[in-house]
């Protein structure tokens, strides 16, 4: 049997909401090291990964690795009630799927819901193995605003980097938009192993960057014409990871 408690029901809700931008059904994989879910869109343009490492889980019990296929909206029904930062969420395996309990540690109030789920083996999707020659970190709201502005002008964005600047630009029908990101303006960190350039869909980028607003320390990595990696951590240890395929 499986039982896991996560310290922030509110963050759990935010992470699941990020997954819901891509799919409404996921396989929650329970392993010795973590709880995670991976999903690849049919067109193979976008992969999203939800992950909570074992060290951020309380009272984690697992007899054997297991996947449980569930509908995210079923989970959100109860997690949406978790307005307090002190609310925890507990997942327990049942014969039919999962029992989900949200408990407010301050008030002692508790809500339960039973979710039907199909038990499966651990999914075998793997992340791209690429060398990200450029990485930078910034507030998620910064990326959300940039994506919104890009979408007003074009359909694809060129992102490039040199020693001290990351540039995101688009041009269409005589209109141009360009954003220059530098260390401390507004980047919190910037590492450029070599000058790099790639082109991505603005529509996909906009959907992903909407989710980044849940974090103040989003890390973006890319290289020459390779998938972009976007890491969105939460204060409670859970995270979302997105991979976006380039336009070639």
From Swiss-Prot:
Signal peptide: none
Entry-linked Pfam families: PCNA_C, PCNA_N
Keywords: DNA replication, DNA-binding
GO biological process: leading strand elongation; regulation of DNA replication
CDD domains: PCNA
Family, similarity comment: Belongs to the PCNA family.
Oligomer and partners: The subunits circularize to form a toroid; DNA passes through its center. Replication factor C (RFC) is required to load the toroid on the DNA. Forms a dimeric complex with PCNA3 and trimeric complexes PCNA123 and PCNA323; does not form homotrimers. Crystal structures show a heterotetramer of 2 PCNA2 and 2 PCNA3, which would be large enough to clamp a Holliday junction.
Protein name from the UniProt record: DNA polymerase sliding clamp 2
Organism name: Sulfurisphaera tokodaii (strain DSM 16993 / JCM 10545 / NBRC 100140 / 7)
Lineage start: Archaea, Thermoproteota, Thermoprotei, Sulfolobales, Sulfolobaceae
Name of the coding gene: pcn2
């Amino acid at each position: 049997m499986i039982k896991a408690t996560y310290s922030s029901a509110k963050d759990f809700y935010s992470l699941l909401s990020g997954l819901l931008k891509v799919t409404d059904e996921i396989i929650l994989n329970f392993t010795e090291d973590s709880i995670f879910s991976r999903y690849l869109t049919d067109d193979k343009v976008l992969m999203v990964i939800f992950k909570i490492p074992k060290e951020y889980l309380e009272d984690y019990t697992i007899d054997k690795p297991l996947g449980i296929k569930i509908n995210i909206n079923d989970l959100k029904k109860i997690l949406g009630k978790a307005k307090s930062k002190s609310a925890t969420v507990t997942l327990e395996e049942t014969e039919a799927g999962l029992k989900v309990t949200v408990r407010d540690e301050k008030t002692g109030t508790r809500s339960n819901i039973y979710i039907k789920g199909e038990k499966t083996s651990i999914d075998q999707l793997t992340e791209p193995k690429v060398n990200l020659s450029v990485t930078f970190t910034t507030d998620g709201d910064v990326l959300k605003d940039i994506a919104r502005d890009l979408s007003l002008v074009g359909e694809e964005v060129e992102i490039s980097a040199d020693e001290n600047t990351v540039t995101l630009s688009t041009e269409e029908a005589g209109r141009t938009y360009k954003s220059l990101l530098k260390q401390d303006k507004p980047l919190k960190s910037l590492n450029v192993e070599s000058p790099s350039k790639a082109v991505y869909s603005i529509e996909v980028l906009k959907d992903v960057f909407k989710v980044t607003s849940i974090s103040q320390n989003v890390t973006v990595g890319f290289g020459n014409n390779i998938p972009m990696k976007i890491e969105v951590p939460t204060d409670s240890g859970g995270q979302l990871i997105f991979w976006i395929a380039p336009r070639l």
